[in-house]
C-alpha cells in the first residue's frame, strides 16, 4: 500500500467525519495516536474535548444548546493498564470492560454494531494500542508496541447486515501510521469508509503533527482534536488537545 499525504488527504476532504490515526514516530521511540471529530449540525459542533483521568471525554461547550446527547457525548479515549483505547463512540467503554475481563479487542466489539443514525448508519471505528515498556520486559529491550483498528459498518447502507473488519499491526514500522475515518466524503446519506486504513506519515514532533492535522481539517466542520505520543520504553506520554470552541 502506498503512503499517502495526510495534508493532501485531509485538505481534499471537507467531511471525513470522525477519524483515528495510530502509528509510530520516525525515530521509532514513540507510539502515536490522534482522534478528531467534525460536525455539520449545531448539536455536533457544540462540543469540546476535556481531559478525564488518563483519557478524554466530549462535553457540550454550551450546555444550553445541547439538544441530544446520544451519540455525541462519550469518552473517546480510555487507558487500561498498558493499553490505550481510542474510538468514536461509547464502544470505548465496551472495549475497556471486555478487555478488563480478559476478552480480546475483537471479542469485546462483538456486542456492538454501527450507529443507529438512519440513513447514515455511521460506522463505529476503534483502535487499541498495546505499549509494553521496559518495566515489563528485559532490561536490554526497548519495549514492545503493537496496535489494531476496527470498523463496524452497515452493508452498503443496509441496516440488517453488519460488516466487521479488524486490522492488526505488529511491531509497526517507524515513521508511518494508519488512518481510518467514518465517511468517505460529504454526502446525503454520508457514505461509509471503504477499504483498509490508509497508510500515512507520522512526525517526531507532537506539536508539528498536531498542527499538520488541525490546519488541514476543514475549517468550517472541524470541532476538536486529540493527539498523544507515548514513549514506548517507559509508557510516559504527552497529550495535545485542540478545540474550535474556546
Feature names for model-found ranges:
Residues 1-246:
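Conserved short alpha-helical segments that host acidic/polar catalytic motifs at enzyme active sites
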Amino acid at each position: 500500500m502506498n503512503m499517502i499525504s495526510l495534508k493532501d488527504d485531509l485538505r481534499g476532504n471537507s467531511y471525513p467525519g470522525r477519524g483515528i490515526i495510530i502509528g509510530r514516530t520516525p525515530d521509532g521511540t514513540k507510539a502515536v495516536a490522534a482522534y478528531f471529530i467534525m460536525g455539520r449540525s449545531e448539536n455536533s459542533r457544540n462540543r469540546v474535548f476535556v481531559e478525564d483521568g488518563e483519557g478524554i471525554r466530549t462535553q457540550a461547550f454550551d450546555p444550553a444548546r445541547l439538544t441530544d446527547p446520544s451519540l455525541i457525548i462519550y469518552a473517546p479515549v480510555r487507558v487500561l493498564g498498558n493499553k490505550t483505547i481510542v474510538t468514536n463512540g461509547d464502544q470505548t467503554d465496551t472495549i475497556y470492560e471486555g478487555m478488563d475481563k480478559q476478552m480480546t479487542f475483537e471479542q469485546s466489539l462483538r456486542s456492538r454494531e454501527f450507529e443507529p443514525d438512519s440513513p447514515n448508519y455511521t460506522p463505529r471505528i476503534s483502535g487499541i494500542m498495546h505499549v509494553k515498556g521496559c518495566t515489563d520486559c528485559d532490561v536490554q529491550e526497548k519495549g514492545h508496541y503493537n496496535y489494531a483498528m476496527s470498523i463496524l459498518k452497515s452493508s452498503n447502507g443496509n441496516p440488517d447486515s453488519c460488516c466487521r473488519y479488524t486490522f492488526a499491526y505488529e511491531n509497526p514500522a517507524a515513521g508511518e501510521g494508519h488512518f481510518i475515518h467514518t465517511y468517505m466524503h460529504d454526502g446525503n446519506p454520508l457514505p461509509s469508509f471503504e477499504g483498509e486504513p490508509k497508510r500515512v506519515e507520522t512526525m517526531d514532533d507532537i506539536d508539528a503533527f498536531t498542527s499538520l492535522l488541525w490546519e488541514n481539517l476543514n475549517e468550517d466542520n472541524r470541532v476538536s482534536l486529540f493527539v498523544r505520543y507515548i514513549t514506548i520504553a517507559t509508557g510516559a506520554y504527552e497529550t495535545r488537545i485542540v478545540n474550535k470552541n474556546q
